[in-house]
């Protein structure tokens, strides 16, 4: 019996945040510039026995199991897991339930502003689908994940996180009035990526936020046609396009200026976007060498994304940790979106001589194989003996 593993990357929202949320997105069209980073949501799935459903989330110290008929009893501790399971049954298994063991973990805390819950839904959805032999493409995967969170569960938010997790990499995404989302992958030069990675720091002050409160405030301002908030959201939408153009041509100083303008506009969309703790951290970072920064995600807490002079990275990090507490870390960008792979519980043994020959040839080519790992090509799969 195969064990399916999957992961979906978390993301940094660079520009356009909030324009992907209803009713703004359908009324005016949203624009999002985002990039995925080397932090992931993971899902590990295998078929259960009998009629048992078992969910585990070690990073949240949660575990639970129930019969298929008693699935609702798991909703309180595992609302996302239950909703994903129900969708997979309805969309890909003809309405027929099946026993399942599903474990998950995420590289960032809830409320981090990195799209962790949406990436988790994408990872669970793709992995559970793969377990029953289905493989939705990135557009279908993102749309279904969005529906699970926003429609099935009624969770507040936009669409950018699901599409970022499904596609991966640098993307400029736009929504149409009919709800269609178009993802435009960006080709960013390697030296531009290297400079951005050298300039980027993430600061986490230890305070997560409830994004639904911030989003509800923004939605209310759009519905009530709050002039300043609506103008600010239009500005954010326009800035996303400007930022994309600057990034493509490699204008990092211009990109940083655009990021700063976007943050200033975002704070006008809701009084909940920033708070004294965020402003204090922002000022400390600026005085130490930060060029521009913004809170990732809806706002109100989570990670502060900073563009700094690469020569002053250590100075900025030490100042923040000394004066504000929390932690500062670098991050790297990733190209790929959600992916699954399988780990056979048992495989047919291969002759030691063949395995040694393969390992020797690969070693001569500079490729190292670990004992027990699975090597796959387009034609065959071998298991290297332990």
Swiss-Prot record:
Pathway participation: Nucleotide-sugar biosynthesis; GDP-D-glycero-alpha-D-manno-heptose biosynthesis; GDP-D-glycero-alpha-D-manno-heptose from D-glycero-alpha-D-manno-heptose 7-phosphate: step 1/3; Lipopolysaccharide biosynthesis; LPS oligosaccharide biosynthesis
Catalytic activity reported: D-glycero-alpha-D-manno-heptose 7-phosphate + ATP = D-glycero-alpha-D-manno-heptose 1,7-bisphosphate + ADP + H(+)
Sites marked Transition state stabilizer: 11
Domain of life: Bacteria
Gene3D superfamilies tied to this protein: 3.30.230.120
Annotated GO biological process: galactose metabolic process; lipopolysaccharide biosynthetic process
Keywords: ATP-binding, Carbohydrate metabolism, Kinase, Lipopolysaccharide biosynthesis, Magnesium, Metal-binding, Nucleotide-binding, Transferase
Binding site for Mg(2+): 117, 149
Record-linked InterPro entries: GHMP_Kinase-Related, GHMP_kinase_C_dom, GHMP_kinase_C_sf, GHMP_kinase_N_dom, HddA/FKP, Heptose_7-P_kinase, Ribosomal_Su5_D2-typ_SF
Function of the protein: Exhibits ATPase activity in vitro.
Assembly description: Monomer.
Family: Belongs to the GHMP kinase family.
Record protein name field: D-glycero-alpha-D-manno-heptose 7-phosphate kinase
Organism field: Mycobacterium tuberculosis (strain ATCC 25618 / H37Rv)
């Amino acid at each position: 019996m195969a064990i399916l593993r999957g992961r979906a990357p978390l993301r940094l929202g660079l520009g356009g945040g909030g324009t992907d949320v209803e009713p703004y997105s359908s009324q005016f069209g949203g624009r999002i510039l985002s990039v995925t980073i080397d932090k992931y949501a993971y899902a590990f799935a295998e078929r259960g026995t009998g009629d048992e459903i078992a969910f585990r989330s070690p990073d949240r110290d949660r575990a639970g199991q129930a019969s298929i008929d008693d699935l609702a009893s798991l909703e309180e501790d595992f609302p996302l897991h239950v909703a994903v399971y129900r969708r997979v049954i309805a969309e890909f298994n003809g309405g027929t339930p099946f026993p399942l063991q599903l474990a998950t973990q995420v590289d960032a805390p809830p409320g981090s502003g990195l799209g962790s819950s949406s990436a988790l839904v994408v990872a669970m959805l793709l992995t559970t689908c793969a377990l029953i032999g289905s493989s939705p493409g990135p557009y279908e995967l993102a749309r279904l994940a969005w529906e699970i969170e926003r429609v099935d569960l009624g969770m507040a938010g936009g669409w950018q996180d699901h599409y970022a997790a499904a596609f991966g990499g640098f993307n400029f995404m736009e929504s149409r009035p009919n709800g269609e989302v178009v993802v435009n992958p960006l080709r960013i030069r390697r030296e531009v990526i290297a400079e951005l990675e050298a300039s980027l720091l993430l600061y986490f002050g230890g305070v997560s936020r409830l994004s639904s409160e911030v989003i509800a405030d923004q939605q209310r301002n759009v519905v009530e046609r709050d002039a300043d908030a609506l103008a600010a959201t239009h500005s954010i939408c326009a800035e996303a396009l400007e930022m994309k153009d600057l990034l493509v041509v490699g204008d990092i100083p211009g990109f940083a200026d655009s990021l700063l303008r976007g943050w200033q506009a975002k704070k006008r969309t809701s009084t909940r976007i920033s708070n004294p703790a965020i402003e204090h951290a922002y000022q400390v970072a600026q005085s130490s060498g930060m060029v521009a920064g913004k809170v990732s995600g809806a706002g109100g807490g989570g990670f502060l994304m900073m563009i700094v002079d690469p020569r002053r990275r250590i100075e900025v990090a030490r100042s923040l940790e000394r004066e504000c507490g929390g932690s500062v870390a670098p991050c790297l960008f990733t190209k790929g979106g959600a992916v699954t792979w399988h780990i056979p519980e048992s495989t047919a043994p291969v002759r030691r001589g063949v395995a040694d020959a393969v390992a020797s040839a690969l070693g001569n080519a500079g490729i190292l194989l670990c004992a027990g790992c699975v090597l796959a090509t387009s034609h065959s799969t071998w298991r290297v003996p332990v």
